[in-house]
Design a protein with these regions (language model features):
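Histidine/lysine/aspartate-rich catalytic loop segments that bind and position anionic ligands
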Residues: 92-126, 130-135
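Glycine-rich phosphate-binding active-site loops on the catalytic face of alpha/beta enzymes
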Residues: 85, 89-95, 128-137, 172-194
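Hydrophobic faces of well-ordered beta-strands that scaffold small-molecule active sites
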Residues: 13-17, 40-42, 64-67, 86-87, ...
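Shared catalytic-loop signature of beta/alpha-barrel
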Residues: 118, 134, 139-157
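Conserved N-terminal beta1-alpha1 strand-loop-helix module at the mouth
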Residues: 1-84, 101, 161-162, 188-214
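Short, ordered loop/turn segments at secondary-structure junctions
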Residues: 44-45, 69, 91-93, 111-112, ...
Length: 214
């Protein structure tokens, strides 16, 4: 099983991919890999998601996660497609148990202290903070660092190139997630060279950010 926290901490930006045509998955993955991306999340939001996930997994440089996973059956499908981790918008004990059974890493989503406590009781330590900006962004994450020092967050939702530095400076943020690295419209338009440029820029920017002391 992938050490998801180490992988996230190394890359610091997790591209969220929404793919409508499975034929776009491999060239998209190759473009991202050429920019230095090694970790991606493909959202299970379209009819093409599962096939696209499997296609992305065929790109040897990439470790692929299934995102927007809501049910245990989707965990099984993701594992069958060779996904190495699963991300959910919320916390489901059934989904976490399925991840354990299928040997894939899990990143459940949280929005409140109660949900964080529940997720940690279930054994999770790397959590998606969603929707980050609407929940108060870095100010809320700072407040949560006191009672939950053991948790590493992946803020997603409203995080973009303009504000990611604020998040990456937080000591309890492992990485930020977002679709701005590979916008759905750019994937549809087959703008893979442009996506590679955006991904490379995001990785360079993330690499320069230094966490504040915890």
């Amino acid at each position: 099983m992938i050490d998801i926290l180490d992988a996230l901490t190394e890359q610091r930006v997790l591209p969220l991919l929404v793919v409508d045509d499975p034929a776009d998955a491999v060239p998209l993955g190759q473009a991202l890999a050429s920019a230095g991306v090694r970790l991606v999340e493909v959202a299970f939001r379209t009819a093409a998601s599962l096939e696209s996930c499997a296609a992305l997994c065929s790109v040897p440089e990439l470790s692929v996660g299934a995102g927007t996973v809501l049910r245990p059956q989707q965990v099984a499908q993701a594992a069958e497609a060779d996904a190495q981790f699963v991300i959910s918008p919320g916390t489901s004990e059934a989904v976490l148990e399925a991840c354990q059974r299928h040997g894939v890493a899990a990143i459940p989503g949280v929005a409140t202290a109660t949900e964080i406590q529940r997720a940690t009781e279930l054994g999770a330590r790397t959590l998606k903070f969603f929707p980050a900006e609407r929940l108060g962004g870095v100010h809320t994450l700072s407040a949560l660092s006191g009672p939950f020092p053991q948790v590493a967050f992946v803020p997603t939702g409203g995080v973009d190139e303009d504000n990611m530095a604020q998040y990456l400076a937080m000591p309890n943020v492992a990485a930020v997630g977002g679709s701005w690295v590979a916008p759905r419209s750019a994937v549809r338009a087959h703008e893979f060279a442009h996506i590679a440029q955006m991904a490379a820029r995001a990785l360079r920017s993330a690499a320069t950010e230094v966490r504040s002391p915890g």
